[in-house]
UniProtKB/Swiss-Prot annotation:
Keywords per UniProt: Cobalamin biosynthesis, Glycosyltransferase, Transferase
GO molecular function: nicotinate-nucleotide-dimethylbenzimidazole phosphoribosyltransferase activity
Catalysed reaction, written as an equation: 5,6-dimethylbenzimidazole + nicotinate beta-D-ribonucleotide = alpha-ribazole 5'-phosphate + nicotinate + H(+)
Gene coding for it: cobT
Principal EC category: transferase
Name this protein carries in UniProt: Nicotinate-nucleotide--dimethylbenzimidazole phosphoribosyltransferase
Domain of life: Bacteria
Keyword Glycosyltransferase: yes
Annotated organism of origin: Escherichia coli O6:H1 (strain CFT073 / ATCC 700928 / UPEC)
SUPFAM superfamilies (alphabetical): Nicotinate mononucleotide:5,6-dimethylbenzimidazole phosphoribosyltransferase (CobT) (SSF52733)
Known partners and oligomeric status: Homodimer.
Length: 359
């Protein structure tokens, strides 16, 4: 789809000059150089994002939760009933799920988006971008057509860009869908080249005696569908799911506006791998929130070259980790904008060679 290709080509590069200025500013703050560690690096990374105009700051915050069912659930790869997807989506509209509580704590809005829930009628209160009532069973067929994947990507990109126009400067991604760690593992295995046995985990408490079947399902899905690891859209369409496509769309949409997007857990790592295959230029806009407890998490993150800020043994999904980490983004912005400067206090520290702290 040419429209998608054209959009991917417009993703702005990180502003290295702005990052250099930010580095000098951070080095001149009222502290020993480097003493705030990763917060300093994060502030500098944010300064380089064109959508923030060289000054790390947070406006409105939004967590976009992509909700979808998966045909591969029929293969016995999850213990939760498929109906839980719809039930939990309804609970999100009431603000009672984990991501809703954590997002409220962070002052972020949660956008609950139906991209493929298997119900006869749309669920009231959800944003309706439903492509179909669940994806195909990847163990016996592709998850969706390439056209479906491309259209959903574009729809989500446009929605994300509209939020940016309305003042959102920090995005988080989340998902909801029974059995969705199976297609996520298939994506990670395909793109990293690692064997399914290395990346398939227990998801939402799958009994260990059922893990061998889940590994076999992922292996069969890859063998049958033959996704091209160099083509992110192909991977998503053949062994992914509508929720994974939606997450990738948020990443692409935020990056196209020069704005940061917080990853969540394993599902978001998989979507990020596919999105980076579509456009490597988005990678500097991706901020990893936490280390998922899912088995293939470190493999996916290593391939992305990302190191999470939190390690909380979390594997809920929903965007819970992204919501939790929003305070870290705000902290990085706060130190950049609100700390005093060494020069103003006539402090000269050994090793600080900054000549013009305000340049």
């Amino acid at each position: 789809m040419q429209i998608l290709a054209d959009l991917l080509n417009t993703i702005p590069a990180i502003n290295s000059a702005a990052m250099s200025r930010a580095q000098r500013h951070v080095d001149g703050l009222l502290k020993p150089v480097g003493s705030l560690g990763k917060l300093e690096a994060l502030a500098i990374q944010l300064a380089g994002m064109p959508g923030l105009n060289g000054i790390p700051h947070v406006g409105k915050k939004a967590v976009l939760v992509m909700c979808a069912d998966h045909g591969v659930w029929e293969e016995g790869v999850a213990i939760s009933p498929k109906e839980v997807t719809a039930i939990q989506a309804e609970n999100m509209t009431r603000g009672t799920t984990g991501v809703c509580v954590l997002a409220a704590q962070a002052g972020a809005n949660v956008h609950v988006i139906d991209v493929g829930i298997d119900t006869a009628e749309p669920i009231p209160g959800l944003i309706n971008m439903r492509v179909a009532r669940g994806s195909g069973n990847i163990a016996s067929a592709p998850a969706m057509s390439r056209r479906q994947a491309e259209k959903l990507l574009l729809d989500v990109i446009c929605y994300t860009r509209e939020l940016a126009k309305n003042g959102v400067t920090l995005f988080g991604v989340g998902e909801l869908g029974m059995a969705n760690t199976t297609p996520a593992a298939a994506i990670v295995s395909t793109i990293t080249g690692r064997d399914p046995e290395e990346v398939v985990g227990i998801g939402a408490n799958l009994p260990t005696d059922k893990l061998a079947n889940k590994i076999d399902v992922v292996r069969r899905a890859i063998t049958l569908n033959q996704p091209n690891p160099q083509d992110g859209v192909d991977v998503l369409a053949k062994v992914g799911g509508f929720d994974l496509v939606g997450i990738a769309g948020v990443m692409l949409g935020a990056a196209s506006c020069g704005l940061p997007v917080l990853l969540d857990g394993f599902l978001s790592y998989a979507a990020a791998l596919a999105a980076c295959q579509m456009s490597p230029a988005i990678k500097p806009y991706l901020i990893p929130s936490h280390l998922s407890a899912e088995k293939g998490a470190r493999i996916a993150l290593s391939h992305l070259g990302l190191e999470p800020y939190l390690n909380m043994d979390m594997r809920l999904g929903e965007g819970s980790g992204a919501a939790l980490a929003m305070s870290i983004i705000e902290a990085a912005c706060a130190i950049y904008n609100n700390m005093g400067e060494l020069a103003a206090s006539n402090i000269v520290l050994p090793g600080n060679t900054t000549s013009d702290l305000n340049s």
